[in-house]
């Protein structure tokens, strides 16, 4: 949560003069020359959520034509992948600045693509630093419904306005037609705006969802350093040292891409640490995890563990100033208690992490408490209606445009 999201400033096409400058690269046209929905997800978790949503959409509307700026999961689900945006995901203010030119070019190419090909809707999936600015640019370009055009702008998975930059809700109401949230408490965060907001349930609790992790007291320790290159490079070495200080025989690590696999190998893990690609079901007796999406998966599975966070010092200092929440892990935030103790920056020492693993594996009361907390999480996030997010999207696409600012 203290991650400084991709903050791209002043990314606007020069429209006052009407001049269209040549772009460093262009996105390919949609498959078959036509498109109904453009999905945009810039992180691995968003790619997974988008893929699940796309499969549900295909079950309800098999003729729907979907293009995507996303990743391999959305491509495998049937999306026409224009660019693998997940391979370009960065974290932290310093890292964003280093990649500014690339993101500016991508931003402008995306605006141009939407102007030319006019999908019925653009579905933004999380990734607010890029996506919210794109929604604003589409309004200013008079492409979106909010700007007087004909492209609906929809957002799936709310930005964490309850953690920082709460005033974004007003610009979201101005630029978006509707928002679907995956956490029930988020609906109230927009109660003072005109933005239509609906809780559609968390995708991890969908009826067809197969959890990627499960608890097994005889299984190895699970180490989850995350899905972003810079974050993994900072977190994985300390996870390794904590595991080695604990003295367990084996550990497993799940990686989402070949890029992250290379980062893991660069840390020279011992032979007792097995690197596994995503896709299967991994058993674990305890987990040391980053604060990302997989931490919630582990919590829902009832695996005892802890959250570990290390960032660029400048990024962390800025995050402490901006973020106004008591916890980093989403499970802790939802429960309003530390289901997963958090070890942040200098507190994430090998000795502290080894002690945490001993507690997770050796204390039966810890496991029992984790099970109770996991059930509370499931009750909090469950949505009784099947395929709610897909139904929401199709309903929004069928509604008559309302060209009014929020």
Residue ranges and their predicted role:
Residues 1-406:
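Nucleotide-activated sugar donor-binding and catalytic core shared by glycosyltransferases
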């Amino acid at each position: 949560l203290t991650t400084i999201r991709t903050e791209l400033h002043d990314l606007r096409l020069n429209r006052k003069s009407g001049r269209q400058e040549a772009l460093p690269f262009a996105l390919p046209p949609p498959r078959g020359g036509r498109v109904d929905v453009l999905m945009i997800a810039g992180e691995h978790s968003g790619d997974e959520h988008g893929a699940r949503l796309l499969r549900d959409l295909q079950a309800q509307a098999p003729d729907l034509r979907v293009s995507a700026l996303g990743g391999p999961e959305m491509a495998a689900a049937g999306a026409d992948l224009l660019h693998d945006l997940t391979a370009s995901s960065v974290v932290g203010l310093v890292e964003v600045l280093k990649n500014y030119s690339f993101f500016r070019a991508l931003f402008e190419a995306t605006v141009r693509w939407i102007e030319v090909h006019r999908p019925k809707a653009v579905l933004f999936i999380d990734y607010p630093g890029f996506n919210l600015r794109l929604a604003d640019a589409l309004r200013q370009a008079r492409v979106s419904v909010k700007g007087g055009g004909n492209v609906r702008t929809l957002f799936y998975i709310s930005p964490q306005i309850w953690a920082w930059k709460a005033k974004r809700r007003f610009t979201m109401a101005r630029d978006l037609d509707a928002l679907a949230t995956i956490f029930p408490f988020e609906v109230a965060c927009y109660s003072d705006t005109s933005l239509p907001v609906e809780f559609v349930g968390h995708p991890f609790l969908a009826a067809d969802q197969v959890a990627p992790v499960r608890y097994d007291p005889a299984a190895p320790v699970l180490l989850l350093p995350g899905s972003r290159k810079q974050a993994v490079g900072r977190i994985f070495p300390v996870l390794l040292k904590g595991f080695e200080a604990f003295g367990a025989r084996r550990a497993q690590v799940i990686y989402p891409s070949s890029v992250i696999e290379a980062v893991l190998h660069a840390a020279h893990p011992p032979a007792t640490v097995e690197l596994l690609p995503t896709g299967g079901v991994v058993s674990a007796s305890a987990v040391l995890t980053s604060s990302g999406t997989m931490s919630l998966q582990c919590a829902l599975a009832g695996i005892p563990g802890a959250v570990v966070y290390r960032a660029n010092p400048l990024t962390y200092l800025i995050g402490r100033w901006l973020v106004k929440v008591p916890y980093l892990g989403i499970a802790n935030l939802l429960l309003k208690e530390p289901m997963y103790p958090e070890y942040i920056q200098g507190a994430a020492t090998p000795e502290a992490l080894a002690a945490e693993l001993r507690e997770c594996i050796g204390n039966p009361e810890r496991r029992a408490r984790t099970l109770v907390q996991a059930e509370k999480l499931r009750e909090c996030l469950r949505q009784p209606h099947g395929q709610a997010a897909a139904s929401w999207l199709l309903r929004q696409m069928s509604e008559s445009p309302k060209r009014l600012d929020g």
